[in-house]
Amino acid sequence: MTFNEAYGYIIKILESYIEQNINDDSLISILSDIDCDVWNDKEPNDPATFDDLRTQLEKYKNEKDLYSENEILLGLRDFLILYKENYGYNLDNCINYISRK
């Protein structure tokens, strides 16, 4: 998958998790930050958070700048761990959910 396809896959995973865990305010906040569909310019609400996600994903891209589903999940997991450890977000349940996929 390209980065844009990987991003779409991540959004689907996170939205699926939120449907099952509606009270996960930490993840809802992060999802809102990386959402590129709110504004007409298709830019994320918080470009820094979006860049953090991209940085974590880029560690796993292959020589063709593509990502497998497993690589996307690893990058997403690393991103969530980063936000848990650096910013105190309560993301343990979501990290476990991602790790089981």
Please give the residue ranges for each predicted region.
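Short terminal alpha-helical segments
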Residues: 3-31
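Short, low-complexity cationic-aromatic patches
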Residues: 1-5, 68-69
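Amphipathic alpha-helical binding modules
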Residues: 48, 70-101
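Short, charged early-sequence alpha-helical segments and their helix-coil boundaries
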Residues: 38-71
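Generic structural signal for hydrophobic core residues of well-folded globular domains
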Residues: 13-21, 34, 57-60, 79, ...
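Charged, low-complexity interaction regions
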Residues: 17-25, 65-66, 83-92
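N-terminal interaction modules that seed assembly of large macromolecular complexes
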Residues: 21-47
